[in-house]
Amino acid sequence: MAQTEIKSYTLNFGPQHPAAHGVLRLVLELSGEVIERADPHIGLLHRGTEKLIEYKTYLQALPYFDRLDYACPMNQEHAYVLAVEKLLGITVPPRAQYLRTLFNEVTRLINHIMNTTSMALDIGAMTPLLYGFEEREHLLEFSERASGARMHAAWFRPGGVARDVPPDLLEDILKFCDSFPKYLDDVEHLLDENRIFKQRTVDIGKVTAQQALDWGFTGPVLRGCGVPWDLRKSQPYDAYAAMDFDIPTGANGDCYDRYLVRMAEQRQSIRIMRQCIEKMPDGPVKAVDHKVTPPSRGEMKSSMEALIHHFKLFTEGFKVPEGETYTAVEAATGEFGVYLVSDGTNRPYRCKIRSPGYVHLQGLDLMSRGHMLADVVANIGSIDVVFGEIDR
């Protein structure tokens, strides 16, 4: 009998595939149903963000950051405003720092709910998504009440935040903090010991701690490998130095551990949100420097200088002293960094964006080799790719 030879063949996964999480085109080399190579093709959502920023004032460039990782927009804004503030050398009022920290965690929950539930949906569990999006709706409502927008907030500004929160919003967030752990318990009851969910995630996409560090992984992907690295602890910014929270880590670096880390992080986010509200100081929410922050309506009605400051700020912007900085924050997906270069004018000379999803997507080949075709879906879900920030 003649021996049959199985030839490897190529399969295009996406960009129309619902589990591609956007516009991912993955060229897979398969031997039967086993993956020999996974080659991500990116750029289908490239909009030239970094170049566009060079033609805008520092204030006009801010909304571009909401449109990068549109699943956790305020984290991206935070990195940019911290970079601008560092170059300007201005101090942010304590209340603004606490409000930023609070909404950083609100945004982290928005992202983690989306990620954990859609990953479960991708591998066959529909119920968590239906539970999760009900809770996520409350969080998007908090964002809307604070900034006026559910997604593209543009609420963080150089020098503070755009406006103070409504009086009853903090009470409502505190009530949410009381009810939210029940949702986490329900999802964990559905998934943690679910035989099918564990078969689809345990020992799938394993990465060792050393491999994760070599590839530059950050966030839940790195912490899932057992490395307790979190910029909120190691390089605290705004009010994080005053917060008491733990860094959840995994042990095996597989899809299941990455899921567990994200679930545990949601409980830590609730802890941080409570502390922010309990310790929230009174006072202004933006620096009192009208060359950088706009004056109030009341001031403009009585002061000609205030009116001039307002007009100049929104037409010409402010000049930033010459210099450069790399400023990073712990976004929901990992280390989101902004390398900002100023040449002393009112526009950035260069703005390089370091997006965690871009780095994690490079590791998809490492995670997928030797696994089955169906496991690619679990891997993509567990690294949490968002193409707004990958393609920029």
Swiss-Prot record:
Enzyme Commission no? 7.1.1.-
Q: Mind listing the UniProt keywords for this protein, alphabetically?
A: Cell inner membrane, Cell membrane, Membrane, NAD, Quinone, Translocase, Transport, Ubiquinone
Q: Which GO terms describe its molecular function?
A: NAD binding; NADH:ubiquinone reductase (non-electrogenic) activity; quinone binding
Q: Which cysteines bridge via disulfide bonds? A: none
Give the reaction(s) catalysed.
a quinone + NADH + 5 H(+)(in) = a quinol + NAD(+) + 4 H(+)(out)
Q: Which GO terms describe its cellular component?
A: plasma membrane
* Compartment(s): Cell inner membrane
Q: What class of enzyme is it?
A: translocase
How does the entry describe its membrane topology?
Answer: Peripheral membrane protein
Record family assignment: Belongs to the complex I 49 kDa subunit family.
Indicate the quaternary assembly. Answer: NDH-1 is composed of 14 different subunits. Subunits NuoB, C, D, E, F, and G constitute the peripheral sector of the complex.
Q: Name the chain's protein.
A: NADH-quinone oxidoreductase subunit D
